[in-house]
């Protein structure tokens, strides 16, 4: 599935996110949104970051992208 981004889409996203997306206490992702019921802008928590993986941990726990031919299974009958 390929998404095609038009210049108007990119401009709209940039306008919404510019100076509007915040990280609080290195844990909470906050976005200011317009509440139509109260006719006011209010903060909305998009989520919480519970864990970060450092480069050292990523290298130690990384899975290999390739396998040797002896590890590959074959569906061919002999």
Swiss-Prot record:
It is found in: Host nucleus. The gene is LEF-10. Keywords: DNA replication, Host nucleus, Transcription, Transcription regulation, Viral DNA replication. Pfam families: Baculo_LEF-10. It comes from the Viruses. This is Late expression factor 10. Belongs to the baculoviridae LEF-10 family. Plays an essential role in viral DNA replication. Coiled coil: none annotated. InterPro entries: Baculo_LEF-10. One of its GO terms (cellular component) is host cell nucleus. GO terms for biological process: DNA replication; viral DNA genome replication.
């Amino acid at each position: 599935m390929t998404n095609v981004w038009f210049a108007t889409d990119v401009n709209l996203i940039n306008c919404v996110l510019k100076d509007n997306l915040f990280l609080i206490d290195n844990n909470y992702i906050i976005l200011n949104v317009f509440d139509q019921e109260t006719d006011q802008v209010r903060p909305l928590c998009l989520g919480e970051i519970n864990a970060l993986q450092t480069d050292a941990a990523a290298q130690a726990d990384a899975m290999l992208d390739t396998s040797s031919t002896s590890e590959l299974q074959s569906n061919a009958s002999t």
